[in-house]
Each structure stands twice: as structure tokens, then as C-alpha cells.
Amino acid sequence: MGNSQTKEFRPPLSSSNRRSHQWGSSSSHGRSPYSDRHHAESSRSRGSRPDLSILGIGGSSERDVATLEHRRETKQEREARRLEKERAARVKERERSMREEHVDGGYLVTQGVYVGTEDFNKAVTRQLMIERRLAPFWRGLNDFSESWTEHQLMAAARGLPIPPPDEIPPELEYKNPPKLSGDGKEPSIQHLMVPITSRSQSYGSEASQSSTPAHSLPAPVSPIASGTSTSPLFRSRAKTLASLTTSKLGSQSDSTPKEIHLPEDPFVNGQPIEAYLYKDATECPICFLYYPPYLNRTRCCDQPICSECFVQIKRPDPHPPEHGEAEPNAAAAEGDRQDNQDCQLVSEPAACPFCVQPEFGVTYTPPPFRRGLVYATDPTLRPNFTSPVSSTSSLASANASPGTGRRRATSLSANDPAVITTDRVRPDWAQKLANARAHAARRSAAATALHTAAYLMNSTASGNESRNFSLGRRGVMRRTGQSETPSASSRSGSPALQALAFLTDRRTPGHDTDSAEEGTGNLAPPRNSSRRNRIDDLEEMMMMEAIRLSLASEEERRKKAEKEARKEAKRREKENKKAEKAARKHGFYSNNASSSALDVPSDARLGRVASTSSSITGEDASPSKGKEVDRTSPAATAASSQSSTEIASESMTINPHPNVVEQGPSAQSSMAQLSPRELPKPSHLRQVSSASSSFSSLVESTGEDHSGAYDGNASSTEPLFNFRSLAAVIGDEDKGDGTAEHVEDTSSKPSAEGSASSTAPVADEMPGQSTTPADPIAVKTVAEDRDCLMPKELETQSVEITSATRNAEATT
């Protein structure tokens, strides 16, 4: 006692020390069979306190752990031991029942046709068989022939080898029936008649029990001692069997009448009872064994079926309703359940194996004789009978109409008193259904709770926000204040999703205006709310979850469509760029800018024009600033200078008249196609630049000497890349004031005006003037490439128009 108190207040030892104390104490007290080896191990592992085992401190802990281990082993093996014990008891009881009990030559226990679990109610089945409302368990024959003799039928019924027809084995020999004297007729007549109430006690007497031999019964039946059938010992053994194999609900200790044995009579009408039963054997259509013709008959289609097959037919396991049907035969205890629970499990009644009609049941017509067990018909016990048909009435009906009558032409109702349904031999089906429903409800509630907790914790959390999953009882239904009141910017998705997430917060009105610093919000319903409110809340949340999923799928579909549209636009843009690049390459290589003679107008009345346009708009400005090394050879530079001089002199020679303007579209097109990214040789670009410089100086030198009229519709080639004619610019100048004007971004002007001015005839053209026709190939190239090249290459051009040019236009 002191050791156990010390153990309670002492700090818990380590597992190794505790184990060492246990084995050490067991070695000192001699309880362990492995004391020597474990004592050595405990001496090594005890450490600094080897004297505890000597004092016996570890004894109590050893007893506790040993008891705990023993209890654990018993708990694991208890179910197996119980099942084994019940199986042994059933085997023993079966042997005893087959040896001592029978009903009209049949048995009250199964014959081993089915080896599965016998889950039917054996007490109810026994009572129905004794009342002759259900056929007993006949012994089935594997083979049968109508030509068999009596001793062959007896051998087949007892399970012995079938002898030849003309040979009778010694064990099958039977004595002749008793002499039909006056003393012998009376018992047989009494056995075939309804038992008289005043003489019912004499059937249990010793004289009536021992008056007939028992050697010719289907099984070796020993005479029972006097008073055994009515003694408490016999009834207690039957009740013990019922208590071992049935539930508490099936025990009918108060309503079960007394069982009595009729006098043993192995003969019926002078024949052995086996020969009388099996001479007209009938095959069971389910197990294909041959039985006496006194079998059960289905109530619906009047088909024979043995009792061993009948007790195997039962209701299917509880399952969800199929095709929306409701259970018609619910138990009375199930009637008070809520109607809104439409997803409960149901248990359908068993169907007939022949015609598949529900509410399977059978009827039984017993043979015209009585042997074995019957219920006593004491008047004091008659009011306690719970069955509508007693053994007396069944005996009377059996004597009135034997089983060889005409086949029934109509089916019987399942509620008929003579019908035994499968629910009768399994009355616990309602309890099994209730247990299955309760189990399903618990599983559904657990799953709903998990889904609800996960939904509440993740409804308003953003995708990148870390989620805090708390699995505690209170933490499952709560979140921190930061996750409960997130900002609008932290939520991803459409406004509809944000609104739905806000609705699913399920906060109380008092918490809607609270800040995030107030702590945890009450997401779960109050504890005092009813179960109905919780169910409604769960249904509402499930509906919101469905709406949220629908909106999320729609949002995902919309994003996917936008992504596809962006991909298509990008693909089209890439194709356009490829086409433009191909067009540029085609225009550049088809028009040689260096080989075209830049047609220079010889009109001296152009005035002083200062061109500030660059040679190529897309060209980088770094070469003009001296930041790049000049890689052009001196020969190329000299060639470019010579080419520019030849251009100026040739233009002055070809156009001697001052007011004749020669348009060179090929020069415009070829110069427009030049680009620093597409030029194959940098020397060509420098040659064009040198020509531009020479031509600019030429225009400035000739502008002072010529002051004649100028045709506004005639356009000349500007220094290199001015694709708009000066005549169009001068025409725009007339619409403005008299001051100088800088024209920027001339690409915005209509290109048709320049084209018209380039092709219009000169109004005041003198005789002898001739205009050089433009190259048709160059004109076509300009028309094709002007739209895509002009906006990029004319942004940096500016033209300054002097007063001399304006006066010339006015004079014209």
C-alpha cells in the first residue's frame, strides 16, 4: 500500500528504469520464468539505485503492468473466445437436439446445408416448428428413387449407405409393430387424436414414456427420465440455448408455453416413420435436395421450399432509397422521425426467389400424425398464447385436410395468420435499420462538420495568404480577426465572388463594424441555438458554396476566353510584322537607290529652301555626331563625291528650262526603302548622304538667280527623303499668314494631293519645254509602300518656306 502511494507521488520514471524495476522485483519474488536473464539486464540498466529491487518497491508497478498486459490480451481475444464458445455450445446443443428432440420425424436444428452464419432467431424458429406452422429441418437426400424399398429409404434417411433391395442390414431391421390389443390401441388412438386436457398430465408419466421402444427413431433417441419434460432442468436448457443464440428482444420466457414429449412411436400406419415420410420425396428447387413432401409453400406462387433455405432468405442490408421510393413497411418506432430527412437508409422486404414478389412468406401443412415435441394445452396457459394458431388447432386442421390435397390457386396476403414471413424469423431487422441509420447520420455529420470547417476557414482567405488550420474543438470553427475581415484588395476574383465571400463570413450584425484588432469573430452559431437552426445554417452555407463554385467556374471560363483572344491578337500582329518585313525586303532589292539618277528640278524660281530633313528617318543619329568610327574606304568616299557632282551637272543639263519640273518617283521610292537595319553595305548609305549634301548646296546656289513663276501643282524631288512635293507645301502656305512656317509631321497630309501635284501639267509652260516621264516601276513601288513607310520616315522633316517662294506662287 505504501509502495502504491509512493508510486503516485513519485515522478514518472523512464521506460527503461521502470522495466528494470519490474524484472528485478519479479526475480526477487520469483514470479518471472525468465528471472535469471532479465535480472542481469536489470542490473545493468538500473543505474545508481540497485537496492530498489531488494526493498520491493518495484513490486506494485510490476503487478499493475502485468495486470494491464493481461487485460489487453483478454480484450483482443475476448471476441474470438466468445465466438468459439458459442460455436462449441451450438455444436453440443445440435448433437443433443438431434438425439433427443424431433418434430414429426424432423429436427429443430439445421442439418449443415449452409455453412454460413446462422443469424436467424432460433427461439422463434423453434416455436414455429413446434406449433407446426413452419416445416422442421428435414434431413435432405442427395439422391432418390421411387423404386427404393423401406429399408433403403430408412438407410437414406439415416445417412447410411444404401443396401441392395433384397438385403436388409442388421442395423435396419425393425420389429413388427406392437400387437393391436386393447391396451395397445388406446395409446395409438390417443396419439392420433387431439390431446384431452384432463389427461394431458399423464403424457409425462413414466408409464407413457416407457411404453414404446425408441430403437427405430430416425436418430438414436434414449428414453428421457421421468419428469424430465416438465422439470425445470429441461426448460432451463432450452432457455439457455435461446439466450446464447438470440438477442434479449427474442427471449419469450414469459409467453412461451410448456413443451412436452409425445409417447415415442416409430411407426405410422404400420410403416417405419422414415419410410412413410420419404416414400414420396420432393426436391427443393433451391438446394436440390430431396425432402418429405411436407415442405413449406410460398404464399405467392405456391412453390415448395425447405426450411433451411427459407431461413437463409432475409432483407437486404440497409441502403439509400433507389428510384426515390419510400419504405412502405417502416417500424412503428420509426414513424416519429422527421419527414425532411429524405436521404435516410431504407430496408426493403425480402422478395420471393421464384416470382420476385415482395413480402416473401410461406405456409406449412403438417403431416397427419404427431410425433415428438408439442406444446401443452393447459387451460391456465391458453390465455397466454401469443400465436394465433396453437398446436391443437393446427393438429385439427392437419387431420381434416392432409397435405396431399389440391394445389392452392390463389396467393395469400402477407398479413394472413397462416403466413410466416422472413421478418418473423428475423425480428431484429428494425433494430439493424435503426443502427445503420444512426451510423450513417454520425458519418454524415462528421463529414459535414469537416467540410463546413474547411469552407469557413477558406471562404475569404486569398490565394497567397497562409492558412492557419486549427484542429481543436474551438479552433475548427474560428479564424483570426485578420482573416475574418480581409481588405477588398486581398480578395481575388470578380466582384460577385467578393460579395459571396462577404456573405459567407456569417458574422453577427454587432461584429460587422468591428475592426480587425478586436480578435476572433464568432463564426459558429451560438451554443444555445437549436439543432434546426444549425441544419438551416449548414444548408445555407452549402447553397452559398454551390453558388461560389458556379461563379468561380464562370470567372475561369471568362479568363480563358480573354487569354485566347490575346493570343490571337498577338499572332495576327506577328503575321503583320512578318508581311511588312517581307514587303520591305522586296521593295529594297527591287529598287536600287544608288543606280537611280536623282532628277533635280532646274527651276530657279524655287527660292531659298533650307532642308533640315535627315537622309533616313530611321537612321541612328550617332554617326552624324562623330561617335562612330567611319569604316568607309577613301575610294568609296571619292566615288560618292563624284556621283553627287555628276547628279547635279546632269540635272542642270537635262532640264535647261527654269519652269520645267521633272518628277522622279523611282528616286523617292528607292530612298524611302532605305533603312540602316536592312542596308547590305554602309558605303551605299554614305554615298546617298553625300549626294544629299551636294544637292542641298545646289538648290541654295540656284535659288537666288531664278525668280520666275512656279507651278504649284508640279512637285520636285526634295533633297532625298521629303516625299511630299514643295508645290503642296506652298499651296498650304497660301492659306496661312505671311510669316514663315515650320511644317511638322507632313505624313498627316493626304498623299493624294502630292500625287496629283506630281502629275498635273504646268499652267504657264513655255513652248519647247519637255517633261521627263516618270519610271512606271518606281511609281508602282511608291504607291504600294507609301502607306506603311511614310508615317515612320517623315516625322523628323521640316520645311522652311521663304517669302520668295510665296511671291512666286502668287505670281503663278
UniProtKB/Swiss-Prot annotation:
Query: What is the taxonomic lineage of the source species?
Result: Eukaryota, Fungi, Dikarya, Ascomycota, Pezizomycotina
Q: Where is the composition biased (Basic and acidic residues)?
A: 34-44, 61-97, 172-187, 317-326, 554-582, 732-747
Where does the protein end up?
Cytoplasm
Task: Work out whether the entry's keyword set contains Isomerase.
Answer: no
Query: What name appears for this protein in its UniProt entry?
Result: Protein sip5
InterPro entries tied to this protein: Sip5/DA2
Question: Coiled coil: which residue ranges?
Answer: none
Q: What does this protein do?
A: May negatively regulate the snf1 kinase.
- As recorded in Swiss-Prot or TrEMBL, the protein's gene is named sip5
Chain intervals with Polar residues compositional bias: 244-255
Region feature (Disordered) = 1-97, 159-187, 200-232, 244-266, 317-340, 384-412, 507-533, 554-718, 732-778
Reply yes or no: does the keyword Cytoplasm apply. Answer: yes
Q: Per the similarity annotation, which family is this?
A: Belongs to the SIP5 family.
Organism encoding this protein? Aspergillus fumigatus (strain ATCC MYA-4609 / CBS 101355 / FGSC A1100 / Af293)
Among the entry's GO cellular component annotations, what is one? cytoplasm
